[in-house]
Every structure is written in structure tokens, then in C-alpha cells.
Amino acid sequence: MEWYLPVIWAAVIGIAVVMYVLLDGFDLGIGILFPFAQNESERDQMTRSIAPYWDGNETWLVLGGAGLFVAFPKAYAVIMPAFYVPVIVMLVALVFRGIAFEFRHVSRSKTGWNIAFAVGSTLATLAQGIILGGLIQGVPVKDGAFSGGSFDWATPFAFVCGLSLIAGYGLLGATWLVMKTEGPVAEKARAHAKALLVAVLASMLVVSLWTPLTEPRIATRWFSLPNFYFLWPVPSVTALIAYLEWRWLEARRDVLPFLATMALFLLGYLGLVISNFPYLVPPSLTIWDTAAVPASQIFMLLGTLLLLPIVIGYIVFIYWLFRGKVREGESYH
């Protein structure tokens, strides 16, 4: 097997996942913050800020899932039974969230749809964090197949990861509102962003300490020499960006806090890659162990490379077309 094909596919899936987290993350964050809006006018302004983008952002989730199925079928066959419950919860929650987003705009009574949008966004985020936590703590595998139980994922660490992601997406949503809205919505979002930034830093600290204490392989990766000398800039830069984001929020900057939040997510993602690569199903299955035959990888890679520029071009165009702040009375429905 050509060693580089699984690496390329791991990069494609990795990019798809991080793009989904960054882009759909602020959509979900808006839903997480929905209960804190004071009235329907504020909620309308919040939804208008994401109306042109939210459905396109989920394209990356489809690409990541399809890429995993096509390029790493053995990993897909292990991950799915290990996380059936949180995956189903995530998908159902995303469906209800999407339905609520569209129907609240045309419904006379928006209360039920508001609840569905908030609950769907929060549950989808919690499920994603639980899946992440379950992967970090490891999936039992025997003879290439999942050998654990249906609820092995239900651990304190996984739920802490789920709550941490809720705080993270909430921060993305709050800083997005700071960047895209005006008036009371932006002011409340700025206050929420400060509180959520503290929560995110606390969550990152807890997870960063918990992980190496319970997973010796990750502790070795980070703290053995000479690895430590090369990796210490990651937490240091994270702390610096968090400090700058706080200062920018205090200085009432609009765009920089959102960019800083995205940088925090990228650094967190980099930490995950450092901790686990080349394992796709920690702690036993690598990208080479689970890869499809080279012919399948090449065929699907050609199709992906043809479609990916179109998707990226469309997304860039939409974000450029609807740049700037959402004004009162504007609607994209």
C-alpha cells in the first residue's frame, strides 16, 4: 500500500472536521445562546446573522463522514458501533435544529421552535464532545472489530469534553454576534464572550491535565524529551491568544475576538493531532491499519479534489457577499 495515500486522506478528513467545527460551531453557538436573548427581536437578529451560511457549513460534516467511510472503512466499522447512541443523538438534534431554524421564521408562535432550536443545538454539541472524549480515552478493539459495550462512551471524561465543547461553541457564537450584530445583541454577546472565554480556558486546562494523567501514551508524547522542547509553544501560544482575546473584548474590537476564538480551536485541534497521530482509533488502529485499498482511495480522491475547489469557492463567495454587520430589518429568508 502506498504509504502516502492514507496520510493524504487523513489530511482531507482532518481539514473537513476542523472546517466543520469552526464554521458550524458558531451556528450551534447561536443556538446555545438562544435562551439568553431577551425577546423575539433579539432572536431574529441572531438568526439573521447566520441565515446565509448555516446550511452550507454542514457540508463539511458530510465530507468528513463520507471520507471516513470511503478511505478508512475499518475505522468507520469500529467507530460507529462504539458511538451509535451519541451519533444518533447528534444527527436527530441537527435535524430538529434545522427544522426549527426554518419554521420559526414563518410560524406565528415561535416559542416551540425557539426551544427546539436551542435544545437541538445544545444536544448536537454535547454529542460531538462526547464522541471526541470517547475517542481520546480510547476504543477497545479486538481482531480489528469493536469489542466494547454500547455505553462505554458514557464516562465522566467524555461528558466533561461535551460540556467543554458547549462552552467552546458558545464562545464562537458570542464572538460571531459581536462581529456581525449591533445594539443590545452585540453588547450581551460581548459579556457572554468574556464569561465563556473563562469557561473555555478552564475546560482546556481540565482536559489537558486529565488526558495525560489517564492516558500514559499521551503523557509520553507530550512530556518525554526531546518532545517537550518542541511542543511547549502550543500551550504557551494558546495562553497568549486567550489573553489577547480578553484585551480585544475589553477594547470593544469587533472582528479580532472571533478570529482569536478560531485560533484557540485550531490550537486545540493541533493538540489533538499531536496527541493521537497516526492513530485514527486510539490506542490501537492507525491510518494505515484501517485504510481502504489504494485503488478506492485514488478514485475517491480524484472526485474529492474536483469538487472541493467548487465547495470552497461557493463558501468564500457567500461569506464575501454577506460580509459586514446585520442591520435591523434586513432578512435573508
Task: Please give the residue ranges for each predicted region.
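Juxtamembrane membrane-water interface segments of multi-pass membrane proteins
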Residues: 28-53, 69-79, 102-111, 174-192, ...
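Alpha-helical transmembrane segments
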Residues: 9-20, 81-92, 118-122, 152-166, ...
